[in-house]
Amino acid sequence: MSAASTAPVLSVAIPAHNEEHCIARCIESIAASARTAGQPVEVVVALNRCTDGTQAVAQALGARCVVDDTRCIAAVRNAAVRATSAPAVATLDADSWMAPGTVAAILMHVNDPRTIGGGTVIWPERMSIGIFFSLLSIAPYVIRRGVSAGMFWFLRESFDAIGGFDESLVSVEDVDFALRLKAFGRARGQKYGTIRRHGITTSCRKFDQFGDWYLFRNPRLVKAIFEGTNQRAAEGFYYDIER
């Protein structure tokens, strides 16, 4: 992402399980956004039980890779963040990609002393009536908590202060992280922010696999996933998925 002699001002931490078909687009979007911002950005990929070419693709694009084979996405996210070197960090899933203005937006917000960190608006790569209603079935679980997720951005010191992602959770570790980051900021007189104009786009591979209406038609599954500790629900929707 930058010359070796230039210290990064932002690190992007990516968890990856067999993502050779997606991660190039993700990393390339970060590089393009960093060039637009004119700032050095580091990419760290945490490889999780990878049996494909994820590592080779990521390293060829300048990313640094670490390995964490724990069957827990929170642990993998933590491994990626803890391997970063910049004072500011963003987390991004391997099947998502930044907009050209995302890096600049992150740096503007994360260095604002009034803000503790935050999330982003997430745009699906495609839309259908089924996806719309499936997203509506998820929205109440997030909106009522007053946080955004998708791609988190924060100072590394804030991440360390709240202990990172909760590794006792098998799902919705992202929402839990957002709530704890928000509470940490509130205690310091800081607000939780959302990057809206320069958000991220994410793949619809879950909908491609399960069907666009799947979440809408399975409200019990949605509820179970948002419990955070339902192993069976998490394994069926996340951990046992072949790529």
Model-derived segments and spans:
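Cell-envelope/extracellular polymer assembly enzymes that use nucleotide-activated donors
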Residues: 9-11, 42, 176
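Short, well-formed alpha-helical segments that are part of the catalytic scaffolds
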Residues: 19-34
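A conserved acidic beta->alpha catalytic loop
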Residues: 29, 47-55, 96
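Short beta-strand/loop segment that forms part of the nucleotide-sugar
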Residues: 39-49
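Acidic donor-binding/catalytic loop of UDP-sugar-dependent glycosyltransferases
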Residues: 53, 94-108, 179
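Glycine-rich, basic loop-to-helix element that forms the pyrophosphate-binding segment
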Residues: 68-84
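Short aromatic/hydrophobic "clamp" motif used to bind/position activated sugar donors
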Residues: 89
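Conserved donor NDP-sugar-binding/catalytic core segment of glycosyltransferases
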Residues: 100-130
